Amino acid sequence: PVLTPLLALLLAREGLPVLLHGMRTEARRVLASDVLEALDIKALAAPETIANGQVAHIHTQHLHPGLARLLAVRQVVGLRNPGHSVVKLMNPCAGPAVVVTAYTHPEYLDMLHATFTSMGMTALLSRGLEGEVATDPRRTPRYDAFVAGQHRLLEEQQPGTAAEVPGLPTEIDVATTAEYTRQVLAGALPVPPALARQVEHILQLAAQIS
């Protein structure tokens, strides 16, 4: 299931303002925005100030119409283009912010490393699952941190895959994912340890720039 909304809400529970941005480029895919809507968190119609402890999400069109048009090309040709890499680097926030992003293919690690360094960005980079920034709950990936472009390896990838994550559903539909998210936030189900670790890394980075 898509766990990016859960990651965002766990961070908000710790007092951070959290913004998710993106758009649909595949017809059948469950998006983080779908799950957030099911949790009664409506999309922003335009950029606005996000309060501490708030999760907001916004369509790429409202941040950069040209980039949204480029991303939409995938629905025509069926392939990703450079816009999919650019959108993962976006920091649409005024003031200090941590960009949380991920790569799927290992060869992108060096490229993203060089980009964050040259642009002086503050970011957390890890290997994601199916294009999502939330970590695979069954594994602990490598984490690379960047503060004003300065790199630090936080954690190497841990070997092995968890045979089971308590309470994690096998279904990936919107309703099931939203209900799982509710149950974890309510304490009825445990936070997956891998996701809790990711939250810790983000909180530590945020503390360095606050």
Regions found by a protein language model. Give the residues of each.
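A generic, well-ordered mixed alpha/beta core segment in the N-terminal half of proteins
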Residues: 1-51, 56
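Glycine-rich anion-binding loops and their surrounding alpha/beta cores
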Residues: 38-41, 49-210
